[in-house]
Each structure stands twice: as C-alpha cells, then as structure tokens.
C-alpha cells in the first residue's frame, strides 16, 4: 500500500495559483499534463526533461504514468512541495535533491520509486537493460559502483531484463560492499546478477 503524502495546509489563494499553473501546462483536450506540457514546464524550470529533478518531481507528485501528471497528482504534488509557481517549484526541487543525497532512507524511497515508474504496462514486473542503465544514471550520483556496474551490464549477454529484486539488490550492494568488492560475501545470498558483477570486477579491476 502506498503511503499517503503529507499535504500541508494551504490557502484558497495558493490553491488558485496551483490550479492556474496546472491549467498553463495541461493538454488542451485532456485534464492532465502530457508530454508536451511536461516539456514546456521543463523549459520554464530551465532543466532538461531527462534531468534528475524531473524524476524527483514525479516522485514527490506520486505520478503513476511516465510523461503525465493528472490534475490531482500535479496540484497535490505542488502542495506537498510547498510550491505554487515555477520559481518556488524550482527552489523546492533543489531542496529535495539535497535531501535525497544526504538522507539514506529518503534516497532508498526515491530509488525504489524509479523502478516502479518504469513499469509502463499492466502486470509488467521487469525493465530492459537499456532502461535500467538510463535510470541508474539519473537516480544515482557519485556512487562508486555505478559506472563499473553499468559497464558490466553493457558487456554481459546473459541478462536482457532486470526485476525489482535485482534492482533493490544493487542498491543494498552499493551501500554495503566496498568499492573494490573486497568484502563481498557470497553467503549473504545476493542475486546471481551481482555474483556475476563481482566476477566481472575481479577480471576487470
């Protein structure tokens, strides 16, 4: 069950400003912000659509579909972010980025969201390797295992897809295992994917 977002108290004027901001970017024929609206919002925020802050925004807004924000997601998300215009949204996203990088529990929540956000089809439980690499590159920053793991994924041929256990396993691995894998313990029952990664690292130190 998804945890309910803590929505701060707000004024009628602030509600109107959030509604106005949603209306500015929403699709003319749908009551949602679609890809074109997201692109315009990104331009106004002065960020690339592939920037980490856009994924952070989707996370804080509880977005269910990549590239889209429903009215409730957008307006309640702005409320959660304590923002009611582009300027305050930009500032809030910068603060969220700092918190994610300094609070392990917050980062883990963001990291877990990133995988689920990539599941675009009903009953989908896996993501392809290319999507995994792209998402890892956005979500993780300055992590010692990130680039070596990406190199491994690009060179290996056994795995075409990644599941949630493997995705979360890499998070735990990145936190618990030394950059050179010297303290890696097979007895901890890591996903086989990570056993193979360690073997790759031993061959490519």
Which residue ranges define each predicted feature?
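EF-hand Ca2+-binding helix-loop-helix modules
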Residues: 1-30, 35-38, 51-57, 65-123
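Amphipathic regulatory helices of Ca2+-sensor modules
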Residues: 33-46, 69-83, 126-141, 164-177
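Generic structural motif recognizing short loop/turn segments at the entrances and edges of beta-strands
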Residues: 43, 51-55, 158
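Short helix/strand-bridging catalytic loops that position acidic/His residues to coordinate divalent metals
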Residues: 59-61, 153
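A short structural micro-motif
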Residues: 61-62, 177
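Extended, charged alpha-helical interaction scaffolds
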Residues: 94-161
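Intrinsically disordered, low-complexity, Lys/Arg-biased terminal tails
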Residues: 134, 142-205
